[in-house]
Amino acid sequence: MDVHRDFLIACIAATNAQGVTEYQSRRFSTYTGSLRELRDWLLANDCKDVCMESTGKYWFPVHNILEESCHVVVSHPKFVKAIKGKKTDKKDAQWIADLFKHDLVRGSFIPPKDIRQLRDLCRYWVKLSSYMTGEKNRAQNCLTVSNFKLDDVFSNVFGKSASAITTQLLEHPGEQFDVAPFVDGRCKTPIAQIQEAVDGIFTYEQAEKLKIIRGHMDSLERHKAELESLILEIAQNYLPQIELLLTVPGIHDAFTAIRILAEIGADMTVFDTSKHLCSWAGLTPQNAESAGKKKTTRIGKSGAYLKPLLIQVALAASRGEKHPEIYGKKQALQKRRGKKKAIVAIARRLLTAIYHI
């Protein structure tokens, strides 16, 4: 199938006993009713093996309709790209059918529906966290522009004491006040230094901007908490797998385990070996060799969500003396290959352990 935003072209390739292949092509819209017609048309022609390329998000509705009745293979466009020449949507669909018929298409990993839903929510949580980081940076910029040096006297500008002082500054602009009642007793910075740090000037525009930013941050925090509750509720069906993941060094909380589970799924048989899983996650060097020379040995770009998470887990596992075997391996690799490559190697070892667990 050649899938587009508003329509798709489906081509059935049927080979008879004499080895002659006959093609049937039809065009369907991407409305749900038309996709059901596509499903019925495929079943009426006894076609239960379907292949399509992953074009953006447009393949999702098609896959959702067909996955219960057909074996659906979704492939990266580079694996089904037609040779240069005359190009039409109908010819593209026929080309994909021919490749699939001869078992020349490498399918992408599509996890079960419940894992896909969990993955979607976890990735949205990552996006909200990114938005929160951006808003914190903008809030800090407002304070810096107005010459409030809270970041010099507090370790966390968004902690309890600093937030209370910021609220006082916004509610009473231009007024002098004593900061002592707003500072927590555990704060080690002298009150006099804090008092000097809050001697800035808020313009009307910067103050209003900061109010909007703080309101947005509160909204993001609330929605993140709601999303976390939903994710934890859905993940209850995978408690045994989550408990196993928590035994891996560096994974200290259930939410991290859930995020890893949402990316790789619970069934490791879809990957032939642990090396296939590591390659899929983008933790192995690329193969780019020509005329006996390696052009690059950089790791791949895949695993945009899983790879950063595993790097964080590797950093946590290789820090301190809790796991001396991992710490020692990281130190040995770091001397020879550098810190970044050492951490990637540790992340790959941890993912290999996850595969076998």
Predicted features by range, described:
Residues 1-357:
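A detector of single, family-specific signature residues
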